[in-house]
Curated annotation (Swiss-Prot):
Family the entry assigns: Belongs to the major facilitator superfamily. TCR/Tet family.
GO cellular component: plasma membrane
Periplasmic side: 1-11, 70-76, 125-137, 186-196, 246-262, 307-341, 417-430
Cytoplasmic compartment segments: 33-48, 98-101, 159-164, 218-224, 284-285, 363-395, 452-471
Name of the molecule in the record: Putative multidrug resistance protein MdtD
Protein species of origin: Escherichia coli (strain SMS-3-5 / SECEC)
Chain's gene name: mdtD
Organism superkingdom: Bacteria
Membrane topology annotation: Multi-pass membrane protein
Keyword list, A-Z: Cell inner membrane, Cell membrane, Membrane, Transmembrane, Transmembrane helix, Transport
Membrane-crossing segments per the record: 12-32, 49-69, 77-97, 102-124, 138-158, 165-185, 197-217, 225-245, 263-283, 286-306, 342-362, 396-416, 431-451
GO molecular function: transmembrane transporter activity
Length: 471
């Protein structure tokens, strides 16, 4: 990339900055949840909605982000994304109630949903094709550093300042990024087809109301009749989308995608697998603080080995898949992650705290291998003309399943804790033990899906997408 013009390198730095902001925010909040609960006068069991409101909004808005960038221009949308994200951060810091915080997090989610896909699109437009891989590696590296710094930085700010500062630090950074975007980034546009607004609204309603219904009466305060109504609305919306997309070449996501067996299996496995994995970043710092009495900063530091394990495995995951095949790798890592989850709970409750960093490092390695394998399995056999649509659907499902995972984790805590969980409670560790056992069971379930994956171990098939025409 040394031969790129200075203006292009500055534009890549702006995109990298956006990736860093978005990835940092996905992890920095987790460590602060118990302190937020105390400050807002809420039960810690309700605080999972702080994560769900953000991730679910990202899932809902992702399908529209690429079309908006093509229609309005990448600079305009990237600038808007940073402004919305920064305003959301300000409103989060000013929130005095949980409901205000949830609305502010949703606004952050709108910005976050546009930031990363539009950033990828920007790189595609400003960098020559032969340098695209190097440019993407450069801009995504800060996105890998964000999760590494997030938990510890969040814990540090909570312990020595207040939870408000995990949002306030975004404001000066966001202002600088917005100004730099206006000054340095070109406003590329492309001719677009008509946006499938009907399909978008049906999917958005279906995802949102079903996730809200899943939270149940304990989280939302809704009556059983109201929850049943939400479920009915969500199911009807998704069924209507399927009818809308059938034989519709302009549908948001073509049903032709599901003619590819590996895509169908990979998407189902990714959805189920990330529900279980999505529980862990939320539950681990909450358990360390409320269940074991760790300080926020100490709990944040304990999350670093998990991120390091994840980053370390990315270098060899292709060799592992080529050696053993997708089916063996996915079944083994799914069951392995379930066992590591049980190991973490056991060592923590036995008081073997010095072992926890090694267990979390192992958890990161296993999780990273499974994530990478799920992603490539899902997309590897799609024909070229469906690859972009399939990737967008996978990205949406990834965010949706993580929001559902956090919702289920909060639901389990509420079920076993009867709304009474605190550091001083004598039953707290028992509540967490039952919750972790349930999580381990849920994490293991996708192994049944992955057992149906063709056991293809040939390198040219395992890491390359076949070019076929979609008939």
């Amino acid at each position: 990339m040394t031969d790129l013009p200075d203006s292009t390198r500055w534009q890549l730095w702006i995109v990298a900055f956006g990736f860093f902001m978005q990835s940092l925010d996905t992890t920095i909040v987790n460590t602060a949840l118990p302190s937020m609960a105390q400050s807002l006068g809420e039960s810690p069991l309700h605080m999972h909605m702080v994560i769900v409101s953000y991730v679910l909004t990202v899932a809902v808005m992702l399908p529209a982000s690429g079309w908006l960038a093509d229609k309005v221009g990448v600079r305009n949308i990237f600038f808007t994304a940073i402004v919305l994200f920064t305003l959301g951060s300000l409103f989060c810091a000013l929130s005095g109630t949980l409901n205000e915080l949830l609305l502010a997090r949703a606004l952050q989610g709108v910005g976050g949903a546009m930031m990363v896909p539009v950033g990828r699109l920007t790189v595609m437009k400003i960098v020559p094709r032969e340098q695209y891989m190097a440019a993407m590696t450069f801009v995504t590296l800060p996105g890998q550093v964000g999760p590494l710094l997030g938990p510890a930085l969040g814990g540090l700010l909570v312990e020595y300042a207040s939870w408000h500062w995990i949002f306030l630090i975004n404001i000066p950074v966001g202002i600088i990024g917005a100004i730099a975007t206006l000054m340095l980034m070109p406003n590329y546009t492309m001719q677009t087809r008509r946006f499938d607004l009907s399909g978008f609204l049906l999917l958005a309603v279906g995802m949102a109301v079903l996730t809200l219904a899943l939270d149940g009466s304990k989280g939302t305060g809704l009556s059983p009749l109201a929850i049943a109504g939400l479920v009915a609305v969500g199911v009807v919306a998704l069924v209507l989308y399927l009818l809308h997309a059938r034989n519709n070449n302009r549908a948001l996501f073509s049903l032709k995608l599901f003619r590819t067996r590996t895509f169908s299996l990979g998407l189902a496995g990714s959805f189920a697998g990330r529900i279980g994995s999505g529980m862990l970043p939320f539950m681990t710092p909450v358990f360390l603080q409320i269940g074991l009495g760790f300080s926020p900063f100490h709990a944040g530091l304990m999350m670093i080995p998990m991120v390091l394990g994840s980053m370390g495995m990315k270098r060899i995951v292709v060799q592992v898949v080529n050696r053993f095949g997708y089916r063996r790798v996915l079944v083994a890592t799914t069951l392995g992650l379930s066992l590591v989850t049980l190991l973490f709970m056991t060592t923590a409750l036995l008081g073997w705290y010095y072992v926890l960093p090694f267990v979390l490092f192992l958890q990161g390695m296993v999780n990273s291998t499974r994530f990478s394998s799920m992603n490539t399995l899902t997309l590897k056999d799609l024909p070229d003309n469906l690859a972009s649509s399939g990737n967008s659907l996978l990205s949406m499902i990834m965010q949706l399943s993580m929001s559902i995972g956090v919702t289920i984790a909060g639901l389990l805590l509420g079920l076993f804790g009867s709304q009474h969980v605190s550091v001083d409670s004598g039953t707290t560790q028992t509540v967490f033990m039952y919750t972790w056992l349930s999580m381990a069971f849920i994490i293991a379930l996708p192994a049944f899906i992955f057992a149906r994956v063709p056991n293809d171990t040939h390198q040219n098939v395992a890491i390359s997408r076949r070019k076929r025409s979609a008939q």
